[in-house]
Amino acid sequence: MERTLRKKRNGRVVSDKMDKTVVVAVETKVRHPLYGKTINKTTKFKVHDEKNEAKINDRVLIMETRPLSKDKRWRLVEIVEKAK
């Protein structure tokens, strides 16, 4: 699979307690089909972090990859912004 065709998401690290894995929350805006109100929908992804460099509240860019474990299908590309 071509790397350019893989999905990319921006999100925030909500957990870094696992070894080589972080949990990233990705927020998307969705319009309600009937009422038209914009709703923030949050999805959590388990992301492979080989060097254990991402910490809680970091903004990160993640990319789709082959299945690495039961739940991990995403990997860390870069840390966009470090937490303060």
UniProtKB/Swiss-Prot annotation:
<keyword id="KW-0687">Ribonucleoprotein</keyword>
<dbReference type="InterPro" id="IPR012340">
    <property type="entry name" value="NA-bd_OB-fold"/>
</dbReference>
<dbReference type="InterPro" id="IPR019984">
    <property type="entry name" value="Ribosomal_uS17_bact/chlr"/>
</dbReference>
<dbReference type="Pfam" id="PF00366">
    <property type="entry name" value="Ribosomal_S17"/>
</dbReference>
<dbReference type="GO" id="GO:0019843">
    <property type="term" value="F:rRNA binding"/>
</dbReference>
<comment type="subunit">
    <text>Part of the 30S ribosomal subunit.</text>
</comment>
<dbReference type="InterPro" id="IPR000266">
    <property type="entry name" value="Ribosomal_uS17"/>
</dbReference>
<keyword id="KW-0689">Ribosomal protein</keyword>
<dbReference type="GO" id="GO:0022627">
    <property type="term" value="C:cytosolic small ribosomal subunit"/>
</dbReference>
<keyword id="KW-0699">rRNA-binding</keyword>
<comment type="function">
    <text>One of the primary rRNA binding proteins, it binds specifically to the 5'-end of 16S ribosomal RNA.</text>
</comment>
<keyword id="KW-0694">RNA-binding</keyword>
<dbReference type="GO" id="GO:0003735">
    <property type="term" value="F:structural constituent of ribosome"/>
</dbReference>
<dbReference type="GO" id="GO:0006412">
    <property type="term" value="P:translation"/>
</dbReference>
<comment type="similarity">
    <text>Belongs to the universal ribosomal protein uS17 family.</text>
</comment>
<protein>
    <recommendedName>
        <fullName>Small ribosomal subunit protein uS17</fullName>
    </recommendedName>
</protein>
